[in-house]
Amino acid sequence: MKLLLVFSLLIPSMVFANSSKFQQVEQDAKVIEASLSAHIGISVLDTQTGEYWDYNGNQRFPLTSTFKTIACAKLLYDAEQGEINPKSTIEIKKADLVTYSPVIEKQVGQAITLDDACFATMTTSDNAAANIILNALGGPESVTDFLRQIGDKETRLDRIEPELNEGKLGDLRDTTTPNAIVNTLNELLFGSTLSQDGQKKLEYWMVNNQVTGNLLRSVLPEGWNIADRSGAGGFGARSITAVVWSEAQSPIIVSIYLAQTEASIADRNDAIVKIGRSIFEVYSSQSR
């Protein structure tokens, strides 16, 4: 956590990385696209050098649950502006329950703080908890407004859980681009939008994610750290956004999005693992 804060002092200008470094990553992505009949988008940003590389990085993909990082960052921002109290409580009603609410479904009739709702949705991807946050913020449009405020002109949130995960081809609602969300994470974790305390809390939630052990975490190089948030949706949507770093490697922000495939969730997970392994190899070989 301290290491990440060191890099929050300066965000360098972005420059396109030498594509030869990522030749294997691109090759792997193309092979996976063909084998799964999928659409894949990738973006990678080195926060120290400002170098970035992308594959279909400006094309749109369903946000799915990767929006939860942004919603909770908005909660932190509003709290810092004195516009919301993260310790305020919301009574949980049975009507609040939606598909996949492992934390909230056990607390019907009880109260939960907004802070705890963010912890629940960030660490378990609890959908009812996400809706509690969205309602407190003023709805999905408030998240989109926040994104525009911090310079993201592409990412948009239009619906709540679980409808936002529809993933229909050509539907602009609830979408992002790999490049846009990498830039947004860079601003939220290393920029000036949030205080250092806010950045640390957002990172803490991402580091303690409990539902991504079979994705990038499974191929993380020894001695590296990761803070991430994943998502899944209709029409084969699968995604992950992550920050990875080590003592020798400055933070790297990665986004991987899959869409429009009939592949199983296991095969989509495996695709993310293979792409992640190739990305990590680029940086681990540099630091040897």
From Swiss-Prot:
Disulfide bonds join C72-C118. The keyword Nuclease does not apply. It is an enzyme of class 3 (hydrolase). InterPro entries: Beta-lactam/transpept-like, Beta-lactam_cat, Beta-lactam_class-A, Beta-lactam_class-A_AS. The keyword Nucleus does not apply. The active site is at S65 (acyl-ester intermediate). Belongs to the class-A beta-lactamase family. This is Beta-lactamase CARB-4. The lineage of its organism: Bacteria, Pseudomonadati, Pseudomonadota, Gammaproteobacteria, Pseudomonadales.
